[in-house]
């Protein structure tokens, strides 16, 4: 085994970080120690994970994640269509002036209201029940599903819930996994908004990850989703 790879695997950060990456977590620059470790050993860990048929990716925004190949040896799950729609809304909010005005803090209610405002409400109600009438009860159930989705995306490292108020959160740069493919000169926020309103498919390269062992209250948001495979 190459010396530097041996050093990487012997590092005390590796066991927990490896588990997080395999569970689909994105490691951003705010995670100082883990991010610095990945920067130091990126080349060696790319070779290590290649043996499992997954790629260690460093995104242009600086965060790291594992991207599965079709022959990956690491178990995969899927994100539901609602998960991905909420992810697109989070990316839109990340690009919004409100993020700076609010010191980067949003509430779960603001997320829900933005979702209802920007996405097709009839389609959203189908996530609750195919025969949904849009009743107050259906809207309440949708709001509960959005909260569950937010918790799933938290585990993926895309949002951080504030420790003193679990109704408030900040958004990380990892939500750019849900971002539109923006051509030079275009307004990223406008392109993202068009993608949300048009209901375009997610341009995710290889899929996102989720550890099924942590699927508390998420059984209805799992493999019957969009079919985008996850490690």
UniProtKB/Swiss-Prot annotation:
Residues 197-231 are annotated as: Disordered. Keywords: Cell cycle, Cell division, Chromosome partition, Cytoplasm, DNA condensation. Pfam families: MukE (PF04288). Gene3D superfamilies: 1.10.10.2250, MukE-like family, C-terminal domain (1.10.10.2260). GO terms for biological process: cell division; chromosome condensation; chromosome segregation; DNA replication. It comes from the Bacteria. It is found in: Cytoplasm, Nucleoid. GO terms for cellular component: cytoplasm; nucleoid. Belongs to the MukE family. Interacts, and probably forms a ternary complex, with MukF and MukB. The complex formation is stimulated by calcium or magnesium. Involved in chromosome condensation, segregation and cell cycle progression. May participate in facilitating chromosome segregation by condensation DNA from both sides of a centrally located replisome during cell division. Probably acts via its interaction with MukB and MukF. This is Chromosome partition protein MukE. It comes from Photorhabdus laumondii subsp. laumondii (strain DSM 15139 / CIP 105565 / TT01).
